[in-house]
Structures are given as structure tokens and as C-alpha cells.
């Protein structure tokens, strides 16, 4: 039986990476890091990426994710995906080009679980983030996009320990 691909979405500074790392450690399984953040730090110009660069992020992320999924036994814990990149493109430009739209659509069927990390934790203000106001607006954009796609998700709130416990209750059921 193939490993389950477990996706974590949420605006910047909602605890995705901490949660994914903790779950990967607990289950001794691989995790897919947020490739887009690393790419943005390296390639952004005036805090923006081009549509072509956003497409490249989604393509690189997908290739790395599929490779890690082959290595997983039970679970791959995935920190964001093409849907997040799609929402960033929508936020930056007001539209999304066809290639990224297609990758976001293909992502709709790839995950066994989708968890949305809530904004109820303190905002960590680092140079690559756009502020707490942006976090709340972007979070709503993600929620709206998930709902428009008809994707079911579990909202994770509270402390890291509470979020871990909630996810484990679903995965171990």
C-alpha cells in the first residue's frame, strides 16, 4: 500500500514547518519542506517573483514531493503545495497563468489528508514575511480557494502539542 501524503497549508507563520517536522520525527517518516520559501529568499526582487518563477516553484516542489513519497513507508508530511503557490500568484498579480493553474488542479487529488494551520498562534515577524495583516488576509484567501475547489480540510488550532495530538488522532484512527 502506498504511503499517505499528508498536506499542511496555512498562511505564513501559522506553524506548518514546526508541525511537519515534529510529526515526521514522531512517525520516523520523511517531510517535504516549504521549497517555495527557500526559492523566494534566493530569487525575489522587491519582494516579488514572476509568474514563470512561481510555476518553477510548483514544478520543483512536485518533483521533490513525488521523490520523497516513494521513500515514505506510512506518511509523507508535506509543507504547502501548488495550491499555496497558486494563491500567492493570485495575490501578487490578480490572476494565475495556465501552467500553475493546472498544477494546482492536479494537487486537488494528491493528498489523503489536508490540514489547515490556524492563525491563532503568535506571529513571528521575520524579514521574509509580510506582516500579521497579510497573514490574516492570505489565510482567508487559502480558505476561500480550498472551499471553491470543494476540498475538505481539518482546521488545526492551539499549541503545537495540541495540533500534533489532533493530527495523530486522525492518522492513527
State where each predicted segment sits:
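Conserved substrate/cofactor phosphate-moiety recognition/catalytic segment
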Residues: 25-62, 167
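P-loop (Walker A) phosphate-binding loop of NTP-binding proteins
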Residues: 11
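Hydrophobic positions on the alpha1 helix immediately C-terminal to the Walker A/P-loop
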Residues: 19
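Pre-Walker A (Motif I) flank of P-loop NTPase domains
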Residues: 2-5, 73
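Conserved nucleotide-sensing/catalytic segment adjacent to the nucleotide-binding pocket
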Residues: 45-95
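Hydrophobic anchor at the beta1->P-loop junction of P-loop NTPases
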Residues: 8
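Conserved lysine of the Walker
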Residues: 16
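A glycine- and Lys/Arg-enriched "phosphate-lid" helix/loop adjacent to the NTP-binding pocket
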Residues: 93-159
Amino acid at each position: 500500500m502506498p504511503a499517505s501524503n499528508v498536506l499542511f497549508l496555512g498562511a505564513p507563520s501559522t506553524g506548518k514547518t514546526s508541525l511537519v517536522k515534529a510529526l515526521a520525527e514522531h512517525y520516523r517518516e520523511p517531510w517535504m519542506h516549504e521549497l517555495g520559501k527557500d526559492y523566494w529568499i534566493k530569487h525575489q526582487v522587491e519582494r516579488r517573483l514572476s509568474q514563470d518563477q512561481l510555476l518553477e516553484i510548483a514544478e520543483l516542489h512536485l518533483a521533490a514531493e513525488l521523490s520523497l513519497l516513494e521513500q515514505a513507508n506510512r506518511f509523507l508530511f508535506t509543507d504547502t503545495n501548488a495550491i499555496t503557490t497558486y494563491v500567492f500568484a493570485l495575490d501578487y498579480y490578480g490572476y494565475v497563468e495556465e501552467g500553475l493553474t493546472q498544477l494546482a488542479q492536479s494537487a486537488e487529488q494528491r493528498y489523503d489528508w489536508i490540514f489547515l494551520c490556524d492563525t491563532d498562534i503568535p506571529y513571528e515577524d521575520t524579514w521574509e514575511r509580510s506582516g500579521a495583516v497579510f497573514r490574516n488576509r492570505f489565510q482567508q484567501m487559502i480558505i476561500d480557494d480550498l472551499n471553491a475547489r470543494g476540498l475538505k480540510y481539518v482546521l488545526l488550532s492551539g499549541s503545537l502539542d495540541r495540533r500534533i495530538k489532533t493530527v495523530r488522532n486522525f492518522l492513527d484512527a
